[in-house]
Amino acid sequence: LDVCAADRDGDGIINDVPENGIVDETLWGNPMTDSSLFEALKADGINAVRIPITWRDHLGDAPDYKVDKDWMNRVKEVVNYAYDLDMYVIINIHHDGGDDSKFGAWVRSASEDYDKFSEKYNALWKQICAEFSEYDDRLIMESANEIGFDDLPQDDAYALLNKINQQFVDLVRASGGYNATRPLLIAGYWTDIAKTCDSRYQMPADPANN
């Protein structure tokens, strides 16, 4: 609640996956992100930004799924533009959860092979957590973006999303540093308020809440 009170006004930054599925910051016509964008937002009274990050084209092979060093460095650079201005910053795994599996989206494959999904999800989030472990509670991690599993019966679909969200919380909390207590943003079902208010949707247990 303290973070919600401090997080007064926000904005979303760049949606970086174009129609052909190749991740590039400029392919939707926007320029490369630089510090001036965040300085302008800050000057307008905005103190929180959500930076959607797509990782799928920048991961190595199983089982490590190593994030490309240049991509991780670029992610941190953009995050730091806002963080260094004392803004709140939300990061996530974004189009990895899209419906375009032919371009490499993989989160929704959890309904078909949970173990394979889980290995990749854990490997990616462990790397993200390690990179940002010393960022304070102005850095907020979001479990996923707009995911649901309509290929499953609805009871099973909700249970699967609940399982993923719990896995996310458990992983982040165990990863050390500020991750033990940092604010987390938990994915709703399709990020749809009506579907997320369904009784089958459950918030994960969080040891940071005692």
Enumerate the predicted regions with their spans.
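Hydrophobic faces of well-ordered beta-strands that scaffold small-molecule active sites
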Residues: 1, 49-51, 89-93, 141, ...
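Non-catalytic accessory regions flanking glycosidase/transglycosidase catalytic cores in CAZymes
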Residues: 1-47, 73, 133-134
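Surface-exposed, active-site-proximal loop segments in enzymatic domains
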Residues: 5, 14-23, 55-73, 97-117, ...
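Alpha-helix initiation/capping motif
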Residues: 24, 34-36, 68, 143, ...
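Aromatic-lined substrate-binding rim segments of carbohydrate-active enzymes
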Residues: 27-100, 120, 161-178
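Glycine/serine-rich loop-strand microenvironments at binding/catalytic pocket rims
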Residues: 76-100, 108-112, 125-143, 158
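Active-site region of glycoside hydrolase catalytic domains
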Residues: 115-210
